[in-house]
Amino acid sequence: MNCLFCAIVNGDIPSKKVYEDEKCYAFLDIAPQAPVHCLVVPKEHIASANDISEENSAVVAHIFTAIPKIAKALGLVNGYRIVSNIGDDGCQSVKHLHFHILGGEKLSDKMA
């Protein structure tokens, strides 16, 4: 498998790590869309939210318990947005499930 995020998790490609535990890895986005923009990925390869199953759903639940810790460590005390793009029409550029944490300023209310 040739997956960019798997290579980052494995340390084959450098990243600016902000959090890591046994199930997930978070790093700063290389093209930030907000003053603070990081990605949280499961260490296990899951292609997208369409591939979440009974067998791997605990990893996704774990990520959502890690996100508040990551946001706090990034100084996002006034709020943040979590985004996940799914599939081509959803503009998913890397086929490895990931969640964007965006914040650091008042975000536009036009997205959701």
Q: Which residues does each PLM region occupy?
A:
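HIT superfamily nucleotide-processing domains
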Residues: M1-A112
